[in-house]
Amino acid sequence: REHVLPSVRMHYHVQDAGKVVNVVPDYSRIWVRVRDITKEGLQPVYEQVRKMAGGAAIMANVEHKVSLISGVHDLLPNRVGGAAMQKNLETLGDIQYTQEEIDFALELQRNNGKPELGIDGKIRPLRETLNSPGGGSTDSGDVSYNVPVVSLAATTAPKGVPWHSWSVVASSGMSIGHKGMLHAAKALGMTMVDIFKDSKLREDIKKEFDEKIGEYDYDPYLDPGPPPIDYVD
């Protein structure tokens, strides 16, 4: 991993490695996932991982097969659509929390050894598009290269709590998470109404989309046909 850019993420899980420890298995399988911020950054790393699989097979004197079971593009943002949604978020205002919800959030932060900052439900100004937007993944990237996509993030957990943790599950499953979900749903619904009613807004969104796509010829990573979901346990 030290030979890739900091934006690259690589994960793996051995799905089948034999049955007993003292017998070399006749079959084994590993699931590897590679991520990067852009498709241009992802492709060479993916190709290198494929070469590594081939090299390992040569060293072990075995046959190997690589099955691509998923592949997504990066997200193509739309500033015009984002500005329309930002207006609706500001109309809705900050997410409001009860004292009971704030106390629950503080307790979660204490249990995780994090600063007791409570819940941040403020609506922030629309930022400039970042070249490196940070962590997280979305499966709407391919959609965004075919039609304009507008998305948002809403608070569903206390500030600073590790995202892949039981604390986020606990928070998302109660009123803190429900409020964030409903806030996001309202903003999405209001923005869709604006797009349906405002022909100029639709034209401006499409114009930006066409300019960003340019001459890019969308080509999905997966081969045509049904998705190979039988490869995933």
Task: Please identify what each model-predicted range represents.
Residues 1-109:
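Midchain, well-structured core segments that form catalytic/ion-binding scaffolds
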Residues 72-233:
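An extended, acidic, His-containing surface patch that forms the Zn2+-binding/catalytic region
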